[in-house]
Every structure is written in structure tokens, then in C-alpha cells.
Amino acid sequence: PIQCIVTCRGINSPLSIQPDTIEISYLMQTGMLVWHAETAQDFYDWILMGYMVSEEPEVHLPLALCCDGFFVTHTKDVVDLTPTDMCLPPYDPYRSPVPCMDMECPPVRMMRDPFIMKSNYISYATHASWQQEVWAAAERSRKHTIAWLNGLIETEDVDADVLIVTSGTAVSQGREAIRLLADEGIRVGLVKIKTLRPWPEEEIKEATKHATHIIVPEFNVI
């Protein structure tokens, strides 16, 4: 499975390097796994973790690792590198849920009409059911994602009456807002969403069950 690195920047005129997460919305219903990094460290670490999850035989889906424009793409930061002797395990295509195609001797379909019609029907039925399998695979990725990312969400002070719930670098700005509000005596909690697919619905419900006000900041100028 491929991994797409998505740097979310303004797609409307004029050209901009500022963050705009509308690009992520185009990926939400494609069947891809979608993760949203807050920092350069997240971005670096999750590339390797993404391969570990997406290459699981029961998952085997492409993954979109998203980060926000400017704050991650156009700034400098210090990250902890993985040890030089740490490598991804070799990918074994024969563990894939989809049979490998031998490009040296590819299969060719040469049949008369009745057989072709039957074959095309089988292809249609396969693709019609495959959509359900893709979404099921995304759900099966949940346990692997939780293990590698240490949960689908990250929380701070969720017993506060006011919570900021967001993803990406809006989390960093949320942390700054929480610091400023604390100086004024206002206590605010934080829920950082790490993955959009799979969507951590139950985790968010549990984290926000005591909140009376929920604020959801995002970078979307359209």
C-alpha cells in the first residue's frame, strides 16, 4: 500500500503557504486511512508507523499522512531521529490479501462472448462488495493504530467545563489559548485527535462527556 504525504495549504487564489485543511475532506470517503500530525515530530514518527499499520495483511490500505502548511512545512524544528539500525521489516507481497500479479507473465483474458459476460458480472459483484471490505479493513486498522500511536486521541484536563477538540497544528494553537486562559483563571481542557480515519468516535464521546462547552478550531478558509 502506498503512503501519501499531504501538506495542507491554501488551494484557492491567491497562492498561499498558510494551512487549509479542506484538502483533507477530499480524502475522508476514499477508503484511505487518514492521520493528521500536529508537529514535525509527529510527522516524522508517523511515516514509519503508517507503514507498519497499512501493511498489516488484514488492513492493506493506502494511508494519507497530513500536516498543516507553514507551521510544519515551512518552519524549522528539532526532531528525535530513529536509530540508524532501526528499519521497517521487509514487505512480503505474498501476505497481501490481493493476489500478486506476475508482470513477467501477466494473465490475459481471451474468451468468447458468453464467458466474457459472466466474467464481467463477477468483476462487477467483486467491486460492489469490495467497498464494504475497504471500510471493514479501515476498522480493522483501529487496533494496530492504537498500539502504534498510543491511542487515537490525546487528552488533557478533560474534566474541565470547556474543551478544545481539534487536530493538526490547531492543537498547538489550542495549547497556547489554554495557557492564556489559565492566566485569566479560566480552566480549559484539550482533546487532540490523531486519526480521522479511523474516526475515534467513542473515544471523543468519552472524553467530552463532562464538558458544557466544546470548541472546535480548524484551518479552513473556504
Listing of model-derived features with the role each one plays in the protein:
Residues 1-5:
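Hydrophobic or amphipathic alpha-helical targeting/insertion segments
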Residues 45-48, 75-78, 175-177:
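A short secondary-structure junction signal
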Residues 8-14, 19-20, 27-29, 140-222:
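Thiamine diphosphate
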Residues 17-69:
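Conserved thiamine diphosphate
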Residues 62-154:
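Conformationally flexible catalytic loops at phosphate/diphosphate-handling active centers
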Residues 6-8, 68:
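Histidine-centered beta-alpha loop that forms part of the nucleotide-sugar donor binding/catalytic region
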Residues 51, 70-81, 202-205, 211:
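Catalytic-core regions of core metabolic enzymes
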Residues 13, 17, 33-40, 120-135, ...:
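Hydrophobic alpha-helical scaffolding
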